[in-house]
Amino acid sequence: MEINMAEKAAFQNPYPLGVSFKNGIARISYAAASKDSPCGIVWYDKRTGRQLKKETFFREERVGRIYCREKKWEDMPKPEEVSYLFWEDGSLVPDRYAKGFVPQPAFGRERSGKDLKAVLLTERYDWQGDVAPEIPMQEAIGYCIHVRGFTKHISSKVEHPGTFAGVTEKIPYLKEIGVTTLELQPAYEFIEKKRPEKSQTQVHAPVFEEKKPVLNYWGYEEGYYYVPKAAYSYSEDSAREFRNMVRQLHISGIEVIMQFYFPVEIPRTEIQEILRYWKLFYHVDGF
């Protein structure tokens, strides 16, 4: 494969990881599990799930284990009409750095990697002059909630129970009880229902016991850290619904802080990048 110097220069800058789109160019960076594994990206129709195109990354595009590609957006639907998955060694791999996903199954349903097709966020959000409340710590009155649990019960009397929109509907209640700082338990995307690995029973023959799926209600595990949880969104656009919630809380003088769970394997530099993203893109007030 021949490559000109302009393309080569672009390939040498693998960050940020994931896929972004700007000025008719899709910028793709994928960190492979192994530098020797064949890998690439698969594009889908966002609505139907139909495969549009499968691409393979080339050795010349690799920096260490990271493959970098800039792709002119030609012979493809509009960016907002497509989704994608990476592939490696024949397996489909969700983008850990995705900023959004296609609509997801209801909370508590089993999901696999192929369900987590990522989407490109191309629409700008109008924050309408949003300003952080900046409540002095000595004056803060905190209130910690699980987004789903806070309004899911019928007694909450909201139109959109168990969602970010439901939290927005409860702002008058939060004001009434004097809350200045709302703390959210994990509200990023995570796989809440998993089937544990089969375990070998204590018998002479190698018989394996099929375990039932277990539910992680709280979300304290590694997740897709850049995306508000789809099951906590009434609409198909969890990013917009989350930002609407933050903006309305700020208008009412209430701060929003978030809890994250990071296993020890996540580098501190990546943690800083994630938190910075939520501050800049979602206007959250702290962690």
Task: Cite the ranges covered by each PLM segment.
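The feature marks proteins involved in alpha-glucan
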Residues: 1-25, 50-54, 61-146, 151-159
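Short edge beta-strand/loop segments characteristic of extracellular beta-sandwich folds
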Residues: 26-33
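Conserved, mostly hydrophobic/aromatic
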Residues: 30, 145, 174, 184, ...
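Extracellular/periplasmic catalytic domains that process cell-envelope and extracellular macromolecules
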Residues: 134-139, 175-176, 251, 280
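Hydrophobic faces of well-ordered beta-strands that scaffold small-molecule active sites
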Residues: 141-143, 182-184, 256-258, 287
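Aromatic- and acidic-residue-enriched carbohydrate-binding clefts of CAZyme catalytic domains
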Residues: 156-163, 195-251, 264-284
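Catalytic domains of carbohydrate-active enzymes, especially glycoside hydrolases
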Residues: 169-188
